[in-house]
C-alpha cells in the first residue's frame, strides 16, 4: 500500500484500481469482513486519482475513512500546560554512545538551552512553542531512564513524543513504555519498519516515524530537530 503513492503510470494505476475493486466486490459477496475492510481501506488511495466518472472508490472510501497521516493537531502534542514534552531512550551500546553525542551537538545553538544532569539531559526551546526534550545518557540506560520516568510520573506528564535510539534488539523495551496519550513514536533503529504492528498494538492512534532499512544518526538527529 505504501508504494501506491509513487506510481504515476496510468496503465498500472488502472490495473491496480480494477484489482482493488474486483477483490472488494468478491470479498463482500463472500461475507469476508476482514478482507473487505482491507480493500475498503485501500480504496482510499485512489479517491483523488480516479478517472472519468469513477465514483465507486469515493463511495466505498467514505465507509473506511482514514485519518491524516502527515498532520497532527498542535493541541495533541502538548500537555495541559501547553508544553510539548519528549522522552528519548538511549541504550548502552556503541550505537547509543555515538548517537547520544551527535544528538546533543545537534541542539547546540542559540535556539536551545541544554541542561546537563549527571545521568540525563533536558533540552528546552528558547523561542517559539515551548518544547522540552528529556533524554537519558547512554551510559545511564537504567538509572537515567528510571529517573526521567519518575519525573514525568511525579508531575503527571505524558511524553507527547517518544523516541527510540539504539539497536533494533532494544526496540521492544522502548515500545513497552508507550503511554496512552503519546502521539508520535520515532523508531530510528535499523529495520524499525518491522516493529510497526507491535507499536500499533500498544496504541492504535499513534503516528509512527520509522526507518525501513538502515537507521543512521546523520538522518535521525537532524530530523528530530525539524520536528
Residue ranges and their predicted role:
Residues 74, 85-94, 135-142, 184-188:
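Second-shell loop/turn segments in exported
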Residues 80, 115, 125-127, 179, ...:
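A generic structural signal for short, solvent-exposed coil/turn residues
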Residues 95-97, 108-154:
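Functional beta-strand-loop-alpha-helix junction segments that form "active/interaction loops"
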Residues 155-227:
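Catalytic cores of nucleophile-dependent amide-cleaving enzymes
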Amino acid at each position: 500500500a505504501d508504494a501506491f503513492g509513487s506510481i504515476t503510470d496510468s496503465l498500472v494505476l488502472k490495473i491496480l484500481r480494477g484489482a482493488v475493486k474486483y477483490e472488494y466486490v468478491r470479498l463482500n459477496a463472500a461475507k469476508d469482513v476482514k478482507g473487505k475492510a482491507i480493500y475498503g481501506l485501500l480504496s482510499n488511495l485512489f479517491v483523488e486519482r480516479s478517472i472519468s466518472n469513477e465514483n465507486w472508490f469515493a463511495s466505498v472510501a467514505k465507509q473506511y475513512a482514514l485519518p491524516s497521516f502527515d498532520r497532527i493537531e498542535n493541541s495533541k502534542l502538548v500537555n495541559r500546560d501547553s508544553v510539548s514534552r519528549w522522552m528519548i531512550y538511549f541504550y548502552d551500546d556503541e550505537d547509543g554512545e555515538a548517537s547520544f553525542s551527535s544528538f546533543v551537538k545537534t541542539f547546540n545553538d542559540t535556539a536551545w538551552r541544554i541542561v546537563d544532569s549527571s545521568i540525563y539531559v533536558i533540552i528546552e526551546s528558547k523561542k517559539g512553542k515551548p518544547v522540552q526534550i528529556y533524554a537519558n545518557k547512554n551510559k545511564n540506560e537504567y538509572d537515567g531512564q528510571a529517573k526521567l520516568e519518575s519525573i514525568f510520573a511525579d508531575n503527571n506528564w505524558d511524553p507527547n513524543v517518544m523516541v527510540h535510539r539504539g539497536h533494533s534488539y532494544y526496540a521492544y523495551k522502548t515500545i513497552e513504555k508507550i503511554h496512552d496519550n503519546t502521539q508520535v513514536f520515532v523508531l530510528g533503529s535499523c529495520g524499525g519498519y518491522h516493529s510497526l504492528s507491535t507499536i500499533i498494538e500498544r496504541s492504535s492512534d499513534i503516528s509512527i516515524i520509522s526507518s525501513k532499512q538502515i537507521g543512521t544518526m546523520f538522518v535521525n538527529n537532524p530530523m528530530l530537530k525539524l520536528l
